[in-house]
A protein has these predicted regions:
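N-terminal targeting sequences that direct proteins away from the cytosol to non-cytosolic compartments
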Residues: 5-59, 67, 130-132, 139-162
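A short, sequence-level motif marking secondary-structure junctions
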Residues: 48, 74-79, 126-130
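Generic recognition of long tandem-repeat/solenoid scaffolds
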Residues: 59-64, 107-111
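Residue-level recognition of conserved beta-strand positions in structured domain cores
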Residues: 73, 137-138
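A short acidic-to-branched-hydrophobic micro-motif
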Residues: 61-84
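Solvent-exposed loop/turn segments at secondary-structure junctions
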Residues: 68, 76-79, 115-116, 141-144
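Signature of long, low-cysteine stretches enriched in small and polar/charged residues
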Residues: 87-133, 139
């Protein structure tokens, strides 16, 4: 009996030492988030701004005699940072009007700043669909405001997502 005990004791001690096979299931694989596709911007630009002066993957610049129009798409996230990028001012120092249109939040604001040739006026709109900030900025000299024949209200009202 003692011999049997001493023979079974090492087997019992080594019984829990077997290597286990690691199993993986589909639930163990992390799923990477996919970015939503960018939507198209629709805007009715003045006739003299029909052709962009500069173009990149994220936007277009239209330079005209008395004003500039900048249309760009930025990644959504920090709205305050987008406002600061467009205007140079913090959101707290501007009056930002928020409305909702076409499944996106719309933010409109204006500002004045010193430019190379005097005071410049700026107006911007941001459409935030949760994935991207679609923006349009118009910059013009304060002196040229009286001379500009463009009806800016129509341009800004036409800015939308398709």
């Amino acid at each position: 009996m003692k011999k049997l005990f001493w023979m079974l004791l090492p087997l019992l001690l080594l019984a829990g030492c077997a290597a286990r096979e690691t199993m993986e299931t589909l639930g163990d694989i992390p799923v990477e988030g996919t970015a939503a596709p960018q939507r198209q911007i629709s805007v009715k630009l003045p006739d003299e701004a029909a052709v962009p002066t500069a173009e990149s993957d994220s936007g277009r610049i239209y330079l005209c005699k008395d004003y500039e129009i900048i249309i760009q798409t930025l990644e959504a996230g920090d709205l305050d940072e987008t406002i600061r990028t467009l205007s140079g001012y913090d959101r707290d120092s501007l009056t930002v009007m928020k409305t909702r249109a076409e499944g996106a939040d719309r933010y409109d604001f204006v500002w004045a700043a010193a430019g190379e040739n005097g005071e410049r006026l700026g107006r911007a709109v941001i459409l935030d669909d949760g994935n991207y900030h679609y923006t349009m900025t118009v910059l013009k000299d304060a002196e040229a405001t009286k001379k500009t024949q463009v009806v800016w209200r129509t341009v800004f009202e036409s800015f939308s997502l398709v």
